[in-house]
């Protein structure tokens, strides 16, 4: 209560359920590049072949937004962010460009999902906001150089926020330890120029433990950069989400966590970041306002 969830809508489902139009069972290709001549999930979505799944998701979100009285556009409505097909400019998801689909197909898929959610009554911008977030590739060079983020932009009518996912991999990858500014600034500048009227967000960021640098200091740097960054279009970062998880990446377990149940004070800089006056935490006594929800 008091917070607004952010739901990432990924364009794949469990093929064991028998849907020939869904993506692979595990979401990503088993080997990098495996998807390049096979995936056409963007086209399938745009052509309506996955509407039954999309509509079930839309109905679930509608029930959540409607609140206890189960009626939209009343005082007990809840707020939610929807993020369809994130990191589309990379090479690891089946909604990226392939031999069988283009960035235009992704745009059409994003718009189609938006329209299906509209169809169940989720049209009030006080309650639902859509986020478009490509990957900040930095020096990792994992992104597709032939299909840049701009080509995937669905348009101002369908997008309420723009942002980037950005990770400091440390020595887990060849890029080495990188500052928040290094991994975020260039990509934020880019999405700012693509959508100059939209508020900026970092829907995902993370830094691993024991990966060649000072994680606690990195959180201090994250606070500084996100608080003082101003885009070429004079926008500021209005929302930040941290990837507080442990996850296997290429067979190696990486500990991204800043807080966990065993020891939530390992990184005091993260706790300090979340408690600064210019951060709004959702809680029962301090509900996020509509203006804050919309990045105003």
Predicted region positions:
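Aromatic-lined carbohydrate-recognition surfaces of secreted/lumenal glycan-active proteins
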Residues: 110-147, 197-211, 237-245
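Substrate-binding cleft of secreted/luminal carbohydrate-active enzymes
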Residues: 80, 198-296
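Substrate-binding cleft of extracellular glycoside hydrolase catalytic domains
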Residues: 1-128, 132, 280-283, 288-295
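Alpha-helix N-cap and loop-to-helix initiation/capping positions
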Residues: 42-56, 97-108, 175-186, 211-221, ...
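Flexible, surface-exposed loop/gating regions in the mature catalytic domains
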Residues: 88-98, 118-182
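Glycoside hydrolase catalytic-domain groove-lining segments
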Residues: 8, 157-212
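Solvent-exposed loop/turn segments at secondary-structure junctions
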Residues: 11-15, 86-91, 135-140, 166-171, ...
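Alpha-helical scaffolding within the catalytic cores
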Residues: 56-60, 136-154, 178-192, 217-229
């Amino acid at each position: 209560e008091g917070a607004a969830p952010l739901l990432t809508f990924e364009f794949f489902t469990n093929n064991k359920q028998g849907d020939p139009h869904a993506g692979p069972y595990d979401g990503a290709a088993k080997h990098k590049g495996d998807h390049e001549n096979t995936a056409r999930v963007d086209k399938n979505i745009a052509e309506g072949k996955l509407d039954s799944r999309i509509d079930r998701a839309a109905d679930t979100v509608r029930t959540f937004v409607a609140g206890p009285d189960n009626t939209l556009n009343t005082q007990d409505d809840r707020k939610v962010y929807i993020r369809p097909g994130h990191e589309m400019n990379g090479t690891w998801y089946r909604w990226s460009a392939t031999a069988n689909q283009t960035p235009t197909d992704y745009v059409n898929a994003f718009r189609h999902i938006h329209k299906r959610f509209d169809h169940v009554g989720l049209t009030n911008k006080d309650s639902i906001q859509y986020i478009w977030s490509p990957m900040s590739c930095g020096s990792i060079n994992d992104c597709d150089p032939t299909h840049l983020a701009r080509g995937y932009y669905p348009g101002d009518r369908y997008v309420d926020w723009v942002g980037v996912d950005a990770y400091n991999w440390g020595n887990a990858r060849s890029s080495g330890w990188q500052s928040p500014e290094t991994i975020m600034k260039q990509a934020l500048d880019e999405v700012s120029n693509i959508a100059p009227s939209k508020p900026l967000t970092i829907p995902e960021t993370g830094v691993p433990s024991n990966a060649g640098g000072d994680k606690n200091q990195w959180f201090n740097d994250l606070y500084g950069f996100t608080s003082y960054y101003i885009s070429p279009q004079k926008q500021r970062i209005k929302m930040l989400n941290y990837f507080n998880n442990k996850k296997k990446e290429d067979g190696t377990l990486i500990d991204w966590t800043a807080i966990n149940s065993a020891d939530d004070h390992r990184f005091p800089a993260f706790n300090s970041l979340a408690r600064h006056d210019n951060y709004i935490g959702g809680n029962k006594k301090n509900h996020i306002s509509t203006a804050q929800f919309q990045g105003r």
